[in-house]
Each structure stands twice: as structure tokens, then as C-alpha cells.
Regions:
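Acidic, polar-rich low-complexity tracts and alpha-helical solenoid repeat scaffolds
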Residues: 1-152
């Protein structure tokens, strides 16, 4: 219904709307219904939105929760879409996507975490990595992670 009206909005708002729509219901029942590559690209689109629209701080606040979820899903998987099926070997599709993401988006705030995840020998206890990402998300000055006025 809204699709026909979106094109009447300013470009920055059209891009915002498309990010929200493309992030909607990507993981029903804790399982991804998009590929790892699509997830990586969606995460990168959020990050590109910040660079393209640096003055849209209010919209960043509205994207914040989805962005955090995308980071967690990309790095740790979901209950029904794990990154490793035996806690030792990384899923090959995940590995390929992390490697592609690192190469394609070297300046992404997610890239250092993907690099570190690739160094893991086992995937049965990633609490230290999870905590590290959580701390980064809570303390970062990155526009999609900064404290928002209503969220303080």
C-alpha cells in the first residue's frame, strides 16, 4: 500500500524506508530466510546510509535496534541458523561471507569482529566475543550506536 507513496518522499527517507522494509521479518522463528551474503549486504547498507546521510540523526535512532540485531545475527547466527553446526567447524557459507565482507567493507565497524571470529578455533563458547560486541555497541560513538535522546 505505502510503496506507491514512498517515491514521493525525499531520497534520504526513501532509503530509510527501504532499509526498514528489507530488515522486516528476516528471521522468523529464529531462522534466517535470507542468505548470509544478503545479511552482510543489508548490514553494509545500514552503514552506507550513515555515510550518505550524516545529518539524519533522528533516523539513525530509529535504525539502531535493527542494526544491532543485524550485527549479532551476522556474527553469531541465530538459534535456527547457527554459524557452526558442530561447534568446531565454521559453516562454509558463513566463512565465505565473512571473508567477502572483510574484503569489500574494510572500514565497516563490523569488520574487526568478523576478522576476530575467523580466528576462533571453536565455536562452542563465544561469550567473550558476544560481550566484546555488546560493550562496543554500548560505548561506541558510531552514529548507529550512539545513545539516542529517547533511549538514554
Amino acid at each position: 500500500f505505502y510503496t506507491k507513496y514512498v517515491k514521493l518522499l525525499p531520497k534520504y527517507y526513501q532509503d530509510f524506508w527501504h532499509l526498514l522494509k528489507d530488515s522486516e521479518n528476516i528471521a522468523p522463528d529464529a531462522g534466517l530466510i535470507i542468505t548470509w551474503r544478503e545479511l552482510g549486504n543489508l548490514l553494509a547498507r545500514y552503514e552506507a546510509y550513515v555515510k550518505a546521510n550524516p545529518t539524519q540523526k533522528e533516523l539513525f535512532c530509529r535504525l539502531q535496534d535493527d542494526y544491532k540485531f543485524l550485527q549479532y545475527a551476522f556474527l553469531f547466527g541465530l538459534d535456527n541458523t547457527p554459524i557452526s553446526y558442530d561447534d568446531v567447524h565454521l559453516d562454509n557459507d558463513v566463512k565465505k561471507e565473512w571473508e567477502r565482507f572483510i574484503k569489500t567493507y574494510p572500514n565497516s565497524p563490523t569488520t574487526p569482529f568478523a576478522k576476530e571470529m575467523l580466528q576462533q578455533k571453536k565455536f562452542d563458547d563465544l561469550e567473550h566475543m558476544y560481550n566484546k560486541l555488546t560493550k562496543f555497541q554500548e560505548t561506541s560513538n558510531y552514529p548507529l550506536l550512539k545513545a539516542c535522546p529517547a533511549k538514554k
